[in-house]
Amino acid sequence: MVGGGRTGIHLLLGFLIGAALALFFFSSTPSIDLTSSLAAFTSCQNQETETNVLEPSALEKGRVYKDLSEHWIVHQDDMPAPPHNQDATPKVTRTRFAATELGTRERVMAAVMAESALALSINATLGRHVPRVHLFADSSRIDNDLAQLTNLSPYKLNGQKTHSMVLGLLFNMTVHNNYDWFLLAKDSTYINPFVLLRMIDTMNWNEPVVMGEAAEDGSGRCRLDTGMLLSQPAMHALMNNRNACNNFALAADDDQLAFEKCIQIATNLTCKPLHQGVRYEVWRGAERADSPAAHDSIEDWKHSPAFKRALAVPRLLSDADASALHDYFVRVEMQRADREIIKMEAELSRLAEQEARETGEAISWPPALPPYAKPPNRYQVSTWEYFTMTELFRSEPNQNVRRLEGKDFDDVAEVVVAARQQVESEEPELEFVQLRNGYRVFDPRRGMDYMVDLTYRKTVNEMPEVDNRFESDNEAAHEESLKEIVVERRVHVSRMIASTQLMNQAPYVKEDTDVTVVIPVASEKDVLPARKLLARQARLCLFPTEEARKTRMVVAVFPLIESRSVTAITNDMEELKRRCKRSLLETDVLPVHPAVSTEGKGTAAAAALDDAVDRYGANTIYLLLSPHADVQKEFFDRARINTIKHYQVFFPVPFVEYHPTISGMEMTEKEEKETPTEQAREAALSRLRDGVEPKRKRTLIVQKEHGRFDSQDFSCFAVYGVDYVTARAKFGQNERRNDLISAFLGQDSIHVLRAVEPTLRIRYHKRSCDMESIDTEDIARCLDSKKENVAAKDQLAKLLFHEK
């Protein structure tokens, strides 16, 4: 009470003193003060006009006012947004598609009047190149083949003309999907798609125009039997005024004439065969009634340049005419493309030479391709692979040579043929002998480059030509002077990257997915490694952290395991669960009863995963671990993020430990220094002969003396349950395998991710391969992995060969 009173006294005194000072310096009448202030302000503002609204007081007359507003900065704050239910601002109506809002459209649409079976041929030839082809047919003329087309719109005339129905259907189709150009034609007219696409790429579409062949009566309308090309503004006018055609239609006019008149009346445009320097070319070689069919006359027509430039060829009689014309125009277009390529290559060579002169650098080959990439350091230098016609030498740590087969053989054979053609075209007198050497390298900017050394045989004449009266002596001397020599030719071949494709974006992945770790224990020799794995996992929980993700540790026990071993594993699982309680770790022992022998790891893994998916469901990640695995905590996070449902499975490349006796890991570093080399070698050989179980005395680290990353080891992988069930259907229930990688290969929807995983290590163990596996590649893969994981080559050499 006393302390609060003392504080309040000071506050009250300060308030009273401030009020007294305010009353002393300022007037107590607010109206007078306001009037004086306003008078002073208006006096300053009206100095130029010398008119004062209010008379300033004596105090205000003595004050001097300065204008400081020129340095002011005006800040305009946005008004607060009103609630959603009180927003009276009209909202902008957005279009559904960005293409509609931006005004982007497809280039051309072809509308074909289907009257016979020729419509199928026109649809097949034109539809491969034009963005949109649509057929319109009278329902009474549609047969079974025509009815199967998805781009067909049938109609019923009901006493009306064809144009009224077709234009009505076109109006409905172009309300939302518009085009720059519209082609109207009959199915008896062949349209050259290559000429059509070049025409629309050359002309501007925003001018109303109707292109085609004008009628002979001079009316100015375009003929429908030779086709007509309408720009987007012309088609827009046709759609808006299409109903006016009915007022001018005559009953005596046929459908084609009525259609032509309707287009002329509705668009109010005259037919133009020439527009912006582009001509609408029509070939009338088969116009007469007695003219042969088009497919019989192509050999005569192809000599005419006008035929090669033709856009429309009317009066087709059969499907053979359309197919023959299309095949011919495809050949013409390919020849034109070849000429353009040759012209472009010459231009690129000229530009490359010009750039080389300006920069002072060497000319890259082939022209227009960037030179070889310069490596940033010596560790990233591109490695050339050496090959012959039977073998391929790769840059691999443990395998130097492989047989040339499969796609590699096809690649080398094609390159050798191309190199031979180049050499033999320049020197036809050479006789090919063999491929001597070959090298290849991949550059991501250039493609695949090859250097091919070819051996040829050449016959030369060593005797100079002299005049001799005896012809027989000349022939004998000439034969003696002939000599075969060996000629070497080196050819550089480049296989450029023809096309690139962006991969589909991978789905979004989160790291909070539940994981079920499955450890199959198929025999007694797997019990001790599995218990060591559980003990290492328990040590990871010595410093537990709060974990929101659930991890389930499951040991799959097979019938061959003794009961005391099962009891020991169960006790270890209980201890693991107790130590990792804060990490949301669950444990379980799963009895498995396979139908076949589990000698192969793949068979045991399949049986364990089958029962695990049945018990725990298919909507979680299953991480299969070998009993001999040694994993770190980070490995589970990578398994979560690299396993994607319905998209990707994760097969890590583990670090496999070498035999500790051969690699010298049974001795500590101090013992290795104190023990002579020969004595250590003899001791290692003795332990190997006696079959002593190796015991590592050093920490297993990722180093080349301790082991290797085995790319042929597929014993550990992560997969979603639903993806495993889908892949499991490829295998029979009684099939024996060494691994399960082949189940996920060859699937379009599932990707296989392989990555080197330093946090996954496989302890050394005597690996057994099931020789009764149904897959020969599976057996070969297991045997190769078993041999290469014994030790490094230098370690084996030091052990087997005594250094003198």
From Swiss-Prot:
Its EC number is 2.4.1.175, 2.4.1.226. InterPro entries: Chond_GalNAc, CS_glycosyltransferase. It catalyses: 3-O-(beta-D-GlcA-(1->3)-beta-D-GalNAc-(1->4)-beta-D-GlcA-(1->3)-beta-D-Gal-(1->3)-beta-D-Gal-(1->4)-beta-D-Xyl)-L-seryl-[protein] + UDP-N-acetyl-alpha-D-galactosamine = 3-O-(beta-D-GalNAc-(1->4)-beta-D-GlcA-(1->3)-beta-D-GalNAc-(1->4)-beta-D-GlcA-(1->3)-beta-D-Gal-(1->3)-beta-D-Gal-(1->4)-beta-D-Xyl)-L-seryl-[protein] + UDP + H(+); 3-O-{beta-D-GlcA-(1->3)-[beta-D-GalNAc-(1->4)-beta-D-GlcA-(1->3)](n)-beta-D-GalNAc-(1->4)-beta-D-GlcA-(1->3)-beta-D-Gal-(1->3)-beta-D-Gal-(1->4)-beta-D-Xyl}-L-seryl-[protein] + UDP-N-acetyl-alpha-D-galactosamine = 3-O-{[beta-D-GalNAc-(1->4)-beta-D-GlcA-(1->3)](n+1)-beta-D-GalNAc-(1->4)-beta-D-GlcA-(1->3)-beta-D-Gal-(1->3)-beta-D-Gal-(1->4)-beta-D-Xyl}-L-seryl-[protein] + UDP + H(+); 3-O-(beta-D-GalNAc-(1->4)-beta-D-GlcA-(1->3)-beta-D-Gal-(1->3)-beta-D-Gal-(1->4)-beta-D-Xyl)-L-seryl-[protein] + UDP-alpha-D-glucuronate = 3-O-(beta-D-GlcA-(1->3)-beta-D-GalNAc-(1->4)-beta-D-GlcA-(1->3)-beta-D-Gal-(1->3)-beta-D-Gal-(1->4)-beta-D-Xyl)-L-seryl-[protein] + UDP + H(+); 3-O-{[beta-D-GalNAc-(1->4)-beta-D-GlcA-(1->3)](n)-beta-D-GalNAc-(1->4)-beta-D-GlcA-(1->3)-beta-D-Gal-(1->3)-beta-D-Gal-(1->4)-beta-D-Xyl}-L-seryl-[protein] + UDP-alpha-D-glucuronate = 3-O-{beta-D-GlcA-(1->3)-[beta-D-GalNAc-(1->4)-beta-D-GlcA-(1->3)](n)-beta-D-GalNAc-(1->4)-beta-D-GlcA-(1->3)-beta-D-Gal-(1->3)-beta-D-Gal-(1->4)-beta-D-Xyl}-L-seryl-[protein] + UDP + H(+). Glycans are attached at N123, N172, N268. It is found in: Golgi apparatus, Golgi stack membrane. The keyword Cell cycle does not apply. The keyword Membrane applies. It comes from Caenorhabditis elegans. Residues 28-804 are lumenal. Pfam families: CHGN. The chain crosses the membrane at residues 7-27. Its main location: Golgi. This is Chondroitin sulfate synthase mig-22. Expressed in seam cells, the vulval epithelium and in oocytes (at protein level).
